[in-house]
């Protein structure tokens, strides 16, 4: 569970740094391209790690395993799409040396990942606690 929290924190940090780089370009010096590449790599590693721990460690709860509500399938589809967006963003940033609009797919996907993952996790915990009462 600690690894899951750490990778979620890494995703959040990566998202915040990308938003700063994207919206505050005057505050960043010439090294912003390398900062983008490093932070994008962190987000790229954090997303699949989150997916792995989310599906392996938390699938024991009855709510997530229940295929009738499709939560696990939704997780796999959503995280798969976000991982593809992240991979595309990483490749384009590496090819262009940063600063590309395609590179911003990475922080968009990280933002969506954080929002959707927390909504899914909250709903799963709420339903599981209601079922146990």
Describe the residue ranges of each PLM region:
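Membrane-helix interface/capping segments
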Residues: 51-74
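Hydrophobic alpha-helical membrane segments
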Residues: 42-49, 69-92, 108-114
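N-terminal signal-anchor transmembrane alpha-helix
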Residues: 1-48
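Membrane-water interface of transmembrane alpha-helices
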Residues: 45-59, 119-123
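Alpha-helical membrane-associated segments of multi-pass integral membrane proteins
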Residues: 5-15, 19, 38, 86-133
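Membrane-interface segments at the starts/ends of alpha-helical transmembrane spans
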Residues: 24, 30-33, 68-69, 97-105
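Juxtamembrane interface helix immediately N-terminal to a transmembrane segment
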Residues: 1-10, 67-78
């Amino acid at each position: 569970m600690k690894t899951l929290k750490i990778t979620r924190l890494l995703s959040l940090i990566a998202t915040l740094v990308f938003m700063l780089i994207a919206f505050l370009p005057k505050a960043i010096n010439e090294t912003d391209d390398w900062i983008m590449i490093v932070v994008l790599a962190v987000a790229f590693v954090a997303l699949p790690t989150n997916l792995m721990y989310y599906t392996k460690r938390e699938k024991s709860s009855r709510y997530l395993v229940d295929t009738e509500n499709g939560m696990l399938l939704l997780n796999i589809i959503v995280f798969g799409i976000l991982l593809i967006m992240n991979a595309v963003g990483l490749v384009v940033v590496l090819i262009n040396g940063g600063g590309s609009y395609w590179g911003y797919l990475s922080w968009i996907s990280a933002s969506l990942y954080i929002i959707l993952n927390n909504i899914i996790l909250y709903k799963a915990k709420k339903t599981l606690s209601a079922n146990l009462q």
